């Protein structure tokens, strides 16, 4: 599966604690305090992001994609670090901010500005728990948030919620943009399920291949694939829902 967020942020916590101890020993107690605080925040995030706990609500992200003031203050060492790291990584990668997988279906990274959004005023599915919805998007785009830790997967039930929501938007001829931090894991898992639900792929494995053709650097891990397997099994055990049913439901649900 590779190194997950718990390991990476855990190492960051240890590094910051060593820096705290070093500064304190060299007689810089005031400079050492921010390092200690950042170390403790990183440790808390590493524990909460562990797959056995998986508590993305820790960061307090609202359903509209914004963060409350208390979260921005309390978790500032983590929240602003991941935003800065994301911006730097995407600048150096040269990868496009989004890719069109099929007509009206886009997957990509966190849209930090309007030019990072696909055309056509798309409905947005945000798969992050750490990235904010930018203020310029508020009210202009239909929005759904399924908060998920980086390198982790949305739960099968959350995937189904996102798929049904996206199907309604497509029935209304509205483009759909699914994003995570980089458009490589969390968002790809949801897009795989959506392609299957819309009849554009036979199963999630074929959907993954289709997405990889359009966005070569995607890399789902074992957690993403496990969630998709569970989602697929639940879908097979549930009554079949055709495209016509989705269109009819969209007429009653325009949210």
Question: What residue ranges belong to the model's regions?
Answer:
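Glycine-rich nucleophile elbow surrounding the catalytic serine of serine-hydrolase chemistry
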Residues: 184-190
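Non-catalytic regulatory/accessory regions that flank a structured catalytic core
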Residues: 1-103, 233-237, 241-255
């Amino acid at each position: 599966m590779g190194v997950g967020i718990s390991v990476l942020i855990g190492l960051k916590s240890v590094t910051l604690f060593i820096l705290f101890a070093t500064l304190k020993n060299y007689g810089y107690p005031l400079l050492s305090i921010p390092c200690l605080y950042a170390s403790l925040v990183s440790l808390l995030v590493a524990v909460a992001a562990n797959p056995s706990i998986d508590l993305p609500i820790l960061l307090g992200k609202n359903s509209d994609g914004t963060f409350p003031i208390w979260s921005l203050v309390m978790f500032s060492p983590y929240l602003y670090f991941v935003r800065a790291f994301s911006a730097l990584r995407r600048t150096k990668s040269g990868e496009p901010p989004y890719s069109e997988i099929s007509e009206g279906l886009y997957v990509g990274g966190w849209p930090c500005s309007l030019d990072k959004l696909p055309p056509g005023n798309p409905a947005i599915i945000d798969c992050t728990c750490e990235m904010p919805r930018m203020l310029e998007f508020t009210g202009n785009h239909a929005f759904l948030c399924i908060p998920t830790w980086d390198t982790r997967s949305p739960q099968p039930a959350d995937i189904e919620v996102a798929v049904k929501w996206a199907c309604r938007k497509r029935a209304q001829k509205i483009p759909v943009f699914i994003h995570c931090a980089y458009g490589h894991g969390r968002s790809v898992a949801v897009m795989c399920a959506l392609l299957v639900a819309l009849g554009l792929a036979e199963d999630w494995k074929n959907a993954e291949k289709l997405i990889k053709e359009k966005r070569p650097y995607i890399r789902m891990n074992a957690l993403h694939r496990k969630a998709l397997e569970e989602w697929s099994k639940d879908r097979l055990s549930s009554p079949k829902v055709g495209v016509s049913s989705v269109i009819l439901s969209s007429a009653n649900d325009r949210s």
